[in-house]
């Protein structure tokens, strides 16, 4: 007799009826199977980012709960990694030589799920099952979902996990790289700095930490909860190669990730300045949408605004 967990994760693919509100932007017959795709232009990445934002707000609205703000702030970061930087194979999620992406701020899982769907790890229709009781797409990323590398929940753990993965790759003489996305509020956690110290001690140069510096945590401003400044100097003091960039500028993101590959003997930290809720006027830089789903009227407005960006 299987327990309930086994039943959830070994079930057949769900039959999903997507409400007539809108269908997800991905066309399943155009899914890529080879990454990274160096042929993608910056304009094509920008166009994909708009579609990804539309899918994020739609799935959260349909799920009735979720974290839109921190998902929308990280779109360009994940699009750069999944489409242009990381070696990965949606047809073989456990490919031994893959690069790994660790979502430490796992409540922002909608941005990860949508990228995984756009890459072909699972059908895009499954996005409509977000937070449903029998879904693989829960409110925090789970390792049994195809393409997810770490089960998340408690903040502060992802950098330690990523460090272990990077060390393991080095011991096995693999050229795999590990990318960890951290929230800036998450940097309040002491475990982040323990991992940061250990990473330089072991000279782990195949590890990159990216801080989504959107300035908001939960329902208020990070500076009012715990002042992190000077954040970049903190990472430098721990011995990391550290750069500060515009986290919505594809050129800056891709350049910083490429430069990180050239750094030897130390890990790299990228402090990416972003706007929570980026791309949607009433969500942008608004703490209210840290963890609140848009209602139907708000969703229609959000989709209209995003369509106007095309």
Question: What are the residue ranges of the model-derived segments?
Answer:
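Thiamine diphosphate
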Residues: 147, 151-154, 159-262
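Glycine/aspartate-rich loop-and-adjacent alpha/beta segment that forms the canonical ThDP
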Residues: 250-310
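N-terminal capping segment at the start of a domain
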Residues: 49-65, 212-215
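Cofactor-binding active-site loop characterized by glycine-rich and histidine/acidic residues
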Residues: 59, 71-194, 200-201
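Short, positively charged and aromatic/hydrophobic N-terminal segments
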Residues: 16-17, 22-27
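Intrinsic-disorder-associated, low-complexity terminal segments enriched in Asp/Asn/His/Tyr and depleted
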Residues: 3-6
């Amino acid at each position: 007799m299987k327990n309930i967990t086994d039943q959830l994760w070994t079930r057949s693919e769900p039959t999903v009826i997507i409400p007539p509100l809108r269908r997800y932007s991905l066309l399943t017959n155009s899914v890529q199977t080879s990454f990274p795709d160096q042929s993608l232009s910056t304009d094509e990445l920008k166009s994909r980012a708009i579609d990804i934002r539309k899918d994020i707000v739609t799935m959260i609205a349909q799920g009735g709960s979720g974290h839109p703000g921190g998902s929308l702030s990280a779109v360009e970061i994940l699009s750069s990694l999944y489409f242009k930087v990381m070696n990965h194979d949606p047809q073989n999620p456990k490919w031994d030589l893959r690069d790994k992406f660790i979502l430490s701020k796992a409540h922002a899982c909608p941005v990860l799920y949508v990228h995984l769907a756009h890459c072909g790890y699972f059908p895009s229709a499954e996005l409509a099952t977000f937070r449903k009781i029998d879904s693989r797409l829960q409110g925090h990323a789970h390792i049994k979902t195809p393409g997810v590398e770490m089960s998340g929940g408690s903040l502060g753990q992802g950098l330690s996990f990523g460090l272990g993965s990077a060390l393991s790759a080095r011991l096995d003489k693999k050229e795999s790289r590990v990318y960890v996305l951290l929230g800036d509020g998450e940097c309040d956690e002491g475990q982040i700095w323990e991992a940061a110290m250990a990473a330089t001690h072991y000279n782990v140069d195949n590890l990159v930490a990216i801080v989504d510096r959107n300035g908001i945590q939960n329902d208020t401003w990070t500076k009012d909860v715990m002042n992190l400044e000077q954040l970049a100097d903190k990472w430098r003091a721990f011995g990391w190669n550290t750069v500060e960039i515009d986290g919505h500028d594809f050129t800056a993101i891709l350049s910083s990730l490429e430069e990180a590959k050239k750094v030897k003997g130390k890990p790299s930290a990228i402090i990416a300045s972003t706007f929570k809720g980026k791309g949607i006027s009433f969500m942008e830089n608004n703490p209210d949408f840290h963890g609140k789903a848009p209602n139907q009227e708000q969703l229609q407005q959000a989709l209209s605004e995003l369509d106007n960006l095309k």
